[in-house]
Amino acid sequence: MGTLTGAGIAVALPAGWEGRIFSREPDLIPTPLRPSAATTTTTTGAIAHLANFALPPDMGDFGSVAVDMMTGPDLLVVLFEHGSEGLGTPLFAASGLPTLSPDDFSPFTLRKLLDGQSGVQRFFTLSGRPFCLYVVLGSHLRRVRTTPVVNEVIRGISVQ
């Protein structure tokens, strides 16, 4: 088991898992009152990609490219930090990392429907930071066996 750290996030990875943690640069957007003036706003913070298969170098924030490669036993966990404008909103009202059940997973939760796969998405606040947890299972039929593995990975996440 190794520990992955970055951007105020630490993850204790089980054997056979790999991951990466990175942050996006803040976006420059025009201010509403002075459209010609750009201001820096963070719309995305840290992103963690965790998987029990080799992650491609060019995958999207929510696993595009990686999900196309997934087979039945493969699991992908994405922790995506939203901008501070999400704090205090109903979407991020839940506090702390979620614990998932097999019934939480649905093929229709996926950002891209792929035969046999299923996913779940949960929004929450942890350590004063708004997050989305997005999990993809390579096989919806194996969800009873694989959900405990996913929960082990989630329990290994800590945020400062």
What residue spans do the PLM features occupy?
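Generic detector of contiguous secondary-structure segments
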Residues: G2-G8, G16, R111-Q121
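Signature of long, low-cysteine stretches enriched in small and polar/charged residues
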Residues: G60-V144, N151
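A short, polar/proline- and glycine-enriched secondary-structure boundary/capping micro-motif
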Residues: S23, V144-T146
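Short, compositionally biased strand/turn segments
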Residues: M1-L4, Y134-V136
